[in-house]
Amino acid sequence: MYVSMQSKCERHSGFFIHLHQNGGISMYQFYVNNELYQVEGDGKLLPFLRDVCKCKSVKDGCSEGACGTCHVLVDGVAMKACIPTLSMMDGRSILTVEGFSDEEKELYAYAFAEAGAVQCGFCIPGMVICTKGLLDKNPNPTRDEIAFALRNNICRCTGYKKIMDAVELAA
């Protein structure tokens, strides 16, 4: 899938997107949840994911990289989406919760619910992204490794013990 227009531009949240058919020229090219996007112009990644890709799991909690609700996996590494620009994503692959397999969604939903790790739920997509990033590289992490993987996520409701329990359960 290419996001863009062949004959005109559409403006979305401060950046331009062109739909190119048959491999037209674009400035940046990257994948979001295994769909190819070609983008001309620049802007922040977070509004692109929410407004263009309709990835609503990517939350805008602070817009300055402090809270972690906007975490996505970029080439398998957890990254906050509110900081990087589209140009920084050129040639990369971005994964949001919407791009998880059905089995992964079921696993994380079960683990976080069973551990009682969810209250308001606002932080959970970012926590789950960081969990997947950790477990993809280390399927049997220690408690310290879990804490390190979740260190850039803020939860104002449950604290972190139940969230860490959920990660252990998912492993």
PLM regions and their residue ranges:
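Short, Lys/Arg-enriched N-terminal segments with co-localized hydrophobic residues
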Residues: 4, 9-26
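Signature of N-terminal electron-transfer/Fe-S-associated modules in redox systems
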Residues: 18-171
